[in-house]
Amino acid sequence: MTQPPDLRVVVGTLFDHHEELKRAVERYPVACRVDRAPPQDRLFRMMRASRAAIAHGGDTLYELACLGVPTAVVCPTVRQLRVADRFAGAAAVLNLGVHRTLTRSRFQRGIIRLLRDTRLRRCLRTAGPRLVDGRGAQRVARTLAELAAS
């Protein structure tokens, strides 16, 4: 028998529906934890240990890609959809679209695919770090130092 996944929902400090989410998760038939704005080092460890993730776009998308975490993206806005489209074009995420138009069926199919398709997860795991290497700040600092020196 297959072991149910260890599910964890992580929300930021600006998320307004934390208590509502916790109540909804308590009704879910699989054990799931809700963490609100964990310390960065703990969040990093959670991301690193994840078999897969569902992200809402933003900076988290870059962090998960850099760490090689296979990720499905549900975008809150069309603006973030453009970013997710570029990530998906580089085979770095599974883009499920904008949440307002995302059907429950499409969401479920996407998540099931992410969890069951080992080839897809392997592809996302390797493409993410190729797209986001985590060294952007170093490149910016080097460029600024070069500009200051000239």
Task: Say what each PLM segment does.
Residues 1-150:
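Nucleotide-activated sugar donor-binding and catalytic core shared by glycosyltransferases
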